């Protein structure tokens, strides 16, 4: 069961299928004890690239980021915690920052490469 939990959380991090189903499954898993999964820059850059290419809907990025940001069992390495926490906060709080566009995604990819 624990490996299934990790797989659901990892699938959400990689945004592998319908976002609604992934978020619901990840929220159910997050309520139970189990191992954490890591969010890293590579995973975020991959999702951003897929939003830029049109494979993923860039307008759903705030929902994805907010879901990940709220999960207790998603961890971020200390070296990446500042930039990825800021990314998740800004992406999930578009009312406080700018609307999500392809240009915003491209800027974040660049920023993560230099942070």
Where do the protein language model's features map onto the residues?
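Acidic, Ser/Pro/Thr-rich low-complexity regulatory regions
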Residues: 1-115
């Amino acid at each position: 069961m624990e490996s299934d939990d990790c797989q659901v959380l990892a699938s959400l991090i990689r945004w592998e299928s319908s976002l609604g189903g992934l978020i619901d499954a990840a929220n159910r898993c997050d309520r139970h004890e189990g191992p954490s999964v890591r969010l890293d820059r590579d995973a975020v850059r991959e999702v951003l690239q897929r939003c830029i290419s049109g494979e993923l809907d860039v307008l759903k990025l705030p929902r994805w980021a907010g879901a990940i940001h709220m999960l207790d069992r998603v961890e971020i390495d200390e070296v990446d915690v500042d930039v990825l926490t800021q990314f998740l906060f800004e992406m999930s709080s578009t009312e406080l920052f700018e609307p999500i566009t392809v240009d915003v995604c491209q800027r974040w990819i660049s920023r993560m490469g230099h942070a």
